[in-house]
Amino acid sequence: MLPPALNIPKWLEANSHLLQPPVNNYCVYHPSSPATAGYTVMIVGGPNARTDYHINTTPEFFYQYRGSMLLKTVDTSVSPPVFQDIPIHEGSIFLLPANTPHCPVRFKDTVGVVMEQPRAEGAVDQMRWYCRGCGEIVWEKQFVCTDLGTQVKEVVEEFGADQEKRTCKACGTIAETRFKEGEIVQPPRFVE
Protein backbone atom coordinates (compact mmCIF):
# COMPACT_ATOMS: atom_id res chain seq x y z
CA MET A 1 0.00 0.00 0.00
CA LEU A 2 1.26 3.48 -0.83
CA PRO A 3 1.86 5.92 2.02
CA PRO A 4 -0.39 8.98 2.39
CA ALA A 5 0.65 12.38 1.01
CA LEU A 6 2.81 14.47 3.32
CA ASN A 7 1.10 17.65 4.52
CA ILE A 8 3.94 20.15 4.92
CA PRO A 9 2.21 22.54 7.39
CA LYS A 10 1.20 19.65 9.67
CA TRP A 11 4.64 18.04 9.36
CA LEU A 12 6.32 21.33 10.34
CA GLU A 13 3.95 21.79 13.28
CA ALA A 14 5.02 18.42 14.70
CA ASN A 15 8.63 18.20 13.50
CA SER A 16 10.21 21.64 12.96
CA HIS A 17 12.52 20.93 15.91
CA LEU A 18 14.29 18.37 13.67
CA LEU A 19 15.63 21.11 11.37
CA GLN A 20 18.80 21.81 13.35
CA PRO A 21 22.23 23.26 12.38
CA PRO A 22 24.63 22.76 10.84
CA VAL A 23 22.65 20.99 8.09
CA ASN A 24 19.08 22.04 9.04
CA ASN A 25 17.38 19.29 7.04
CA TYR A 26 15.31 16.21 7.62
CA CYS A 27 14.95 13.43 5.07
CA VAL A 28 11.20 12.76 4.72
CA TYR A 29 11.68 10.25 1.90
CA HIS A 30 14.86 8.21 2.11
CA PRO A 31 16.37 6.55 -0.98
CA SER A 32 16.29 3.15 0.71
CA SER A 33 12.48 3.29 1.07
CA PRO A 34 10.83 1.09 -1.60
CA ALA A 35 8.21 3.69 -2.56
CA THR A 36 10.78 6.41 -3.40
CA ALA A 37 12.49 4.72 -6.37
CA GLY A 38 15.78 5.87 -4.88
CA TYR A 39 14.89 9.56 -4.64
CA THR A 40 15.79 11.64 -1.59
CA VAL A 41 13.32 14.30 -0.46
CA MET A 42 14.34 16.66 2.34
CA ILE A 43 12.59 19.44 4.19
CA VAL A 44 15.14 22.14 4.91
CA GLY A 45 14.80 25.03 7.34
CA GLY A 46 16.67 28.19 8.08
CA PRO A 47 18.79 29.80 9.18
CA ASN A 48 21.72 28.10 7.51
CA ALA A 49 24.72 30.24 6.63
CA ARG A 50 27.45 27.69 5.89
CA THR A 51 30.08 28.69 3.34
CA ASP A 52 30.67 25.27 1.76
CA TYR A 53 29.66 24.36 -1.78
CA HIS A 54 28.18 20.92 -2.40
CA ILE A 55 28.72 19.15 -5.71
CA ASN A 56 26.27 16.38 -6.54
CA THR A 57 26.49 14.19 -9.66
CA THR A 58 22.72 14.46 -10.18
CA PRO A 59 20.40 17.47 -10.58
CA GLU A 60 18.73 18.90 -7.48
CA PHE A 61 15.17 20.24 -7.43
CA PHE A 62 14.41 23.14 -5.08
CA TYR A 63 10.92 24.25 -4.01
CA GLN A 64 10.79 27.21 -1.66
CA TYR A 65 7.76 26.64 0.55
CA ARG A 66 8.11 29.58 2.99
CA GLY A 67 10.22 32.73 2.69
CA SER A 68 13.10 33.17 0.28
CA MET A 69 16.58 31.70 0.03
CA LEU A 70 19.75 32.44 -1.90
CA LEU A 71 21.45 29.68 -3.89
CA LYS A 72 25.10 30.61 -4.41
CA THR A 73 26.49 28.75 -7.44
CA VAL A 74 29.72 28.46 -9.40
CA ASP A 75 29.84 27.94 -13.16
CA THR A 76 33.00 25.85 -13.53
CA SER A 77 32.52 25.32 -17.28
CA VAL A 78 34.27 28.65 -17.96
CA SER A 79 37.67 29.96 -16.94
CA PRO A 80 37.86 31.67 -14.57
CA PRO A 81 34.78 30.18 -12.87
CA VAL A 82 31.80 32.53 -12.52
CA PHE A 83 30.11 32.96 -9.15
CA GLN A 84 26.34 33.54 -9.45
CA ASP A 85 23.70 34.11 -6.78
CA ILE A 86 20.23 32.78 -7.62
CA PRO A 87 17.35 34.00 -5.43
CA ILE A 88 14.58 31.45 -4.94
CA HIS A 89 11.42 33.19 -3.73
CA GLU A 90 8.49 31.74 -1.79
CA GLY A 91 6.44 29.51 -4.06
CA SER A 92 9.24 29.24 -6.63
CA ILE A 93 11.04 26.19 -7.97
CA PHE A 94 14.53 25.80 -9.41
CA LEU A 95 16.29 22.84 -11.02
CA LEU A 96 20.05 22.90 -10.42
CA PRO A 97 22.06 21.04 -13.08
CA ALA A 98 24.22 18.11 -12.01
CA ASN A 99 27.82 18.80 -10.96
CA THR A 100 27.15 22.47 -10.17
CA PRO A 101 28.91 23.69 -7.02
CA HIS A 102 26.20 25.25 -4.87
CA CYS A 103 25.85 26.80 -1.45
CA PRO A 104 22.24 27.12 -0.26
CA VAL A 105 21.87 30.07 2.11
CA ARG A 106 18.66 29.90 4.10
CA PHE A 107 17.33 32.58 6.38
CA LYS A 108 15.41 32.53 9.67
CA ASP A 109 11.86 31.17 9.49
CA THR A 110 12.24 29.84 5.93
CA VAL A 111 11.42 26.34 4.75
CA GLY A 112 12.14 24.60 1.47
CA VAL A 113 11.92 21.17 -0.07
CA VAL A 114 14.89 19.66 -1.92
CA MET A 115 14.66 16.53 -4.06
CA GLU A 116 17.66 14.61 -5.36
CA GLN A 117 17.72 11.88 -7.97
CA PRO A 118 19.27 8.53 -7.12
CA ARG A 119 23.05 8.59 -7.37
CA ALA A 120 24.82 5.97 -9.46
CA GLU A 121 26.52 3.20 -7.50
CA GLY A 122 29.80 4.60 -6.15
CA ALA A 123 29.05 8.18 -7.28
CA VAL A 124 31.29 10.71 -5.55
CA ASP A 125 29.90 13.86 -3.90
CA GLN A 126 32.17 16.76 -3.04
CA MET A 127 32.20 19.52 -0.45
CA ARG A 128 34.28 22.51 -1.46
CA TRP A 129 35.26 25.86 0.01
CA TYR A 130 36.30 28.76 -2.20
CA CYS A 131 38.52 31.63 -1.08
CA ARG A 132 36.49 34.78 -0.64
CA GLY A 133 39.66 36.80 -1.24
CA CYS A 134 40.82 35.39 -4.59
CA GLY A 135 38.20 32.81 -5.67
CA GLU A 136 40.56 29.82 -5.64
CA ILE A 137 39.60 26.49 -4.10
CA VAL A 138 40.71 26.45 -0.45
CA TRP A 139 39.87 22.82 0.35
CA GLU A 140 37.59 20.06 -0.84
CA LYS A 141 36.66 16.58 0.23
CA GLN A 142 35.16 13.78 -1.83
CA PHE A 143 32.95 11.01 -0.44
CA VAL A 144 30.48 8.39 -1.56
CA CYS A 145 27.19 9.68 -0.21
CA THR A 146 25.30 7.19 1.92
CA ASP A 147 23.74 9.59 4.47
CA LEU A 148 23.82 13.22 3.38
CA GLY A 149 22.81 14.66 6.75
CA THR A 150 25.54 13.01 8.82
CA GLN A 151 28.27 13.07 6.17
CA VAL A 152 27.90 16.79 5.38
CA LYS A 153 28.00 17.61 9.09
CA GLU A 154 31.20 15.57 9.55
CA VAL A 155 32.96 17.28 6.62
CA VAL A 156 31.90 20.76 7.79
CA GLU A 157 33.19 20.01 11.30
CA GLU A 158 36.47 18.58 9.93
CA PHE A 159 37.07 21.75 7.89
CA GLY A 160 36.12 24.07 10.74
CA ALA A 161 38.47 22.37 13.20
CA ASP A 162 41.60 22.69 11.04
CA GLN A 163 42.98 26.17 10.30
CA GLU A 164 45.51 24.73 7.83
CA LYS A 165 42.65 23.32 5.73
CA ARG A 166 40.91 26.71 5.96
CA THR A 167 43.95 28.68 4.74
CA CYS A 168 44.03 29.57 1.02
CA LYS A 169 47.27 28.37 -0.57
CA ALA A 170 47.06 31.14 -3.20
CA CYS A 171 46.61 34.25 -1.04
CA GLY A 172 46.68 33.20 2.63
CA THR A 173 43.10 34.22 3.43
CA ILE A 174 41.57 32.07 6.16
CA ALA A 175 38.17 30.74 5.10
CA GLU A 176 35.28 30.92 7.53
CA THR A 177 32.74 28.12 7.94
CA ARG A 178 29.80 30.54 8.24
CA PHE A 179 28.85 33.86 6.74
CA LYS A 180 28.92 36.75 9.21
CA GLU A 181 25.62 38.08 10.55
CA GLY A 182 24.13 40.48 7.98
CA GLU A 183 26.75 39.67 5.34
CA ILE A 184 24.24 38.01 3.02
CA VAL A 185 21.08 39.95 2.18
CA GLN A 186 17.89 37.92 2.06
CA PRO A 187 16.07 38.22 -1.27
CA PRO A 188 12.48 39.53 -1.15
CA ARG A 189 9.97 36.92 0.00
CA PHE A 190 8.04 37.10 -3.26
CA VAL A 191 9.09 37.88 -6.83
CA GLU A 192 8.80 41.62 -7.37
UniProtKB/Swiss-Prot annotation:
Substrate binds at E60, R106, E116. A divalent metal cation binds at C131, C134, C168, C171. Its main location: cytoplasm. Keywords: Cytoplasm, Dioxygenase, Iron, Metal-binding, Oxidoreductase, Pyridine nucleotide biosynthesis. Its cofactor is Fe(2+). Pathway: Cofactor biosynthesis; NAD(+) biosynthesis; quinolinate from L-kynurenine: step 3/3. It holds the Pfam family 3-HAO. Its EC number is 1.13.11.6. One of its GO terms (cellular component) is cytoplasm. Fe cation binds at H54, E60, H102. It is found in: Cytoplasm. It catalyses: 3-hydroxyanthranilate + O2 = (2Z,4Z)-2-amino-3-carboxymuconate 6-semialdehyde. O2 binds at R50. One of its GO terms (molecular function) is ferrous iron binding. One of its GO terms (biological process) is anthranilate metabolic process. Catalyzes the oxidative ring opening of 3-hydroxyanthranilate to 2-amino-3-carboxymuconate semialdehyde, which spontaneously cyclizes to quinolinate. HAMAP family: 3_HAO. This is 3-hydroxyanthranilate 3,4-dioxygenase 1. It comes from Aspergillus clavatus (strain ATCC 1007 / CBS 513.65 / DSM 816 / NCTC 3887 / NRRL 1 / QM 1276 / 107). The gene is bna1-1.
